[in-house]
């Protein structure tokens, strides 16, 4: 899940 900084699941 992208919290707005790093694109991660």
From Swiss-Prot:
Q: State which tissues express it.
A: Corpora cardiaca.
Q: Does the keyword Transcription regulation apply?
A: no
Broad class of where this protein is predominantly found: secreted
Keyword vocabulary terms for this entry: Amidation, Neuropeptide, Secreted
- Leucine amide PTM positions read 9
- Localization per Swiss-Prot or TrEMBL: Secreted
The cellular component terms of Gene Ontology attached to this UniProt record, alphabetical and capped at eight, are: extracellular region
Q: Does the keyword Secreted apply?
A: yes
| GO BP term, example | neuropeptide signaling pathway
This molecule's function is given as:
Mediates visceral muscle contractile activity (myotropic activity).
Family of this protein: Belongs to the pyrokinin family.
Q: What is this protein called?
A: Pyrokinin-1
